[in-house]
């Protein structure tokens, strides 16, 4: 196969181009307290397929309301109706809800439509952040989440570093039956990415108040 010449499928912006995303291709969060939540997260309880999940995410984002990515590895794929040119400045903004002491750093990946088919199936590149190459950063981290055996239970997980744990069920705050995405039919699923060295700590000493300090630069939802 002959690769097309660089820039063949470049789509310059014009007067009708949107300033924001144009299409959501996939929404796959990790389990978490906001996943499937009918009250604060806007789920309907009938998101049973990946297509339902995409429709949910598009509806929320069109209304400029957040979507949760859950625990580690959750992701959303958004596309634009034009190419975003790298001018060496700030060309892309991702809004979050962080505040001082509550940063949840999200790593950003970008892709250009090299084959011109309009799908997110070309080469992805991770944008560098302040922790890239730092001691404690794990570049090829993978975590597997397991479907709870019954409603109201924690979500168990294991990773490729030999660790295991759980995402606690916090029914007093988020009482939906499951924190495991309803539209994921498999009994387990694995998410991959770069894991930063954790900075969060229990300021209360009893687990009631956790502080999540920010990282220097390069991450979404990072104060």
Where in this protein do the model-derived segments appear?
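A domain-level signal for the mature, folded cores of soluble proteins
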Residues: 2-106, 123-223
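Short loop/turn segments immediately following beta-strands, especially the blade-tip
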Residues: 111-117
């Amino acid at each position: 196969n002959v690769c097309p010449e660089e820039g063949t499928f470049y789509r310059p912006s014009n007067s009708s181009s949107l300033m924001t995303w144009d299409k959501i291709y996939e929404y796959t969060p990790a389990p978490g307290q906001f996943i499937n939540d009918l009250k604060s997260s806007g789920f309907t309880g009938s998101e049973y397929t990946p297509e339902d999940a995409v429709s949910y995410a598009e509806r929320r984002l069109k209304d400029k309301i957040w979507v949760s990515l859950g625990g580690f590895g959750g992701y959303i794929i958004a596309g634009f109706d034009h190419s975003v040119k790298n001018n060496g400045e700030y060309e892309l903004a991702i809004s979050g809800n962080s505040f001082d002491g509550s940063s949840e750093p999200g790593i950003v990946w970008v892709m250009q439509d090299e084959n011109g088919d309009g799908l997110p199936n070309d080469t992805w590149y991770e944008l560098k952040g302040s922790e890239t190459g730092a001691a404690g950063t794990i570049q090829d981290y993978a975590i597997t989440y397991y479907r709870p055996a019954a409603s109201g239970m924690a979500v168990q997980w294991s990773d490729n570093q030999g660790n295991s744990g759980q995402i606690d069920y916090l029914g007093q705050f988020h009482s939906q039956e499951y924190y495991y995405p309803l539209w994921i039919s498999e009994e387990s699923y694995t998410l991959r990415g770069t894991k930063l060295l954790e900075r969060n700590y229990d300021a209360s000493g009893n687990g009631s108040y956790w502080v999540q300090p920010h990282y220097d630069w390069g991450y979404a939802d990072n104060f």
